[in-house]
Amino acid sequence: MNNVQQSSKRWLSLGWKVMAGWGWLNIIFAVIVPLVTLLVSPTMMTYGSDDAKFTGASWDKIVALSPELGFWIGLMMVSMCMMMIAYGILQMKVSKIPYQRGEKWAWHTLLWANLLYFIYGAGLTFTFFSRGIYGSFTSGISVGLPFLVVWVLVLIFGLWLPRRELNQ
């Protein structure tokens, strides 16, 4: 590839790396959360202080009501993380090979997968916002305002800016 083609694809060069990194982040998060939830404490990543505000029940109250309910809540998070691993693997592989080459189908696949994922995550988070809980990574459900901002930046730099550099 000559220098003209290389420089004209600067956003795509950044974009595929951002999206592949986003996939890796999802995989890492999806491995760490179940380990912490099951082996250390569910209150660190599965049922945080924002969740207690949302439900009106502390983790201790839930476990006092039913230890099995607490365990079940942890298993729900583990099952969600199982899906995040698959999402992360697909995100990373589609980004690394076809999106890096500028293939439009890869961009469309990443766009739709990430927009739907974002809408779902933002919807859950706005449910918390509607109750005055803005979050800073202290919930197993809501991603919180800081993470929504990061997510928007990932979509801008990973997909929006590179869109014009795709192969025709």
Regions found by a protein language model. Give the residues of each.
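Topology signature of small-to-medium multi-pass alpha-helical membrane proteins
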Residues: 2-168
